[in-house]
Each structure stands twice: as structure tokens, then as C-alpha cells.
Amino acid sequence: MKSMEEMMQAAQQAAENIQNQMNDMQVKLDSIEVEGAAGGGLVTVRATAKGRILGVNIDDSLMKLEEKHMVEDLVTAAFNDARDKADRVSAEQMKEMQGSMGLPPGFNLPGMG
């Protein structure tokens, strides 16, 4: 049987491993790109799975003063579409990482959804 000190060291090592995996996952999520679109692709927003916006593209046909409000609405919709996709990818990646840790289904670590 393990001593209390050995069990504490094992718990500390497990916590460090989890922290390292979480840090690795944050780096991975920042490297995965998603694209949100609105207006049939007239406005697109590229973002990382971590939610960092990489770019916005607005079709030239929308660059008219009378289209200003529509462009604003489309940019908002494209941003929200990209954010939703980033959230889904992030949740999938975290679930995959959690599964690789051998944790029981439904057991959620802080920061893992």
C-alpha cells in the first residue's frame, strides 16, 4: 500500500499533467480556424476556435452607403456564426482531451465545459 506521501506526490503529478494538457489544448484551439458567414457568403469572419478574430471579408457589392445598415447586420451575423463554430470546435476538442484522461462520462474539470 502506498504511503500518504506517495499518494500526495501522485496527486500532484496528476494535477500537473492535467494543467499541461489544458495549456496544450489552449495552444491547439488558437491554431484551429473556423469561418462564419452571412448573407450567402457576402460577409465572412475568420476566427480561431479560441475566439480570436483573424479577419473580416466584405464583398465589394456591399460597399455602398445605402447598404451600411445591412453590412453592419451581416458582419454581426457572421461574427456570431464564427463564434458558434469556435465554441463547438472547442467543446469537441475539450471532450476529446477529457476522454483521453480516462475520466468518467459527465465528469467535468474546470475550464472544460
Question: What residues fall within each predicted segment?
Answer:
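Long amphipathic alpha-helical segments used for membrane anchoring, targeting, substrate engagement
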Residues: M1-S31, E35, K85-G113
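A short interface-forming secondary-structure element
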Residues: V56-K68
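N-terminal intrinsically disordered, cationic/polar leader segments
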Residues: A37-V56
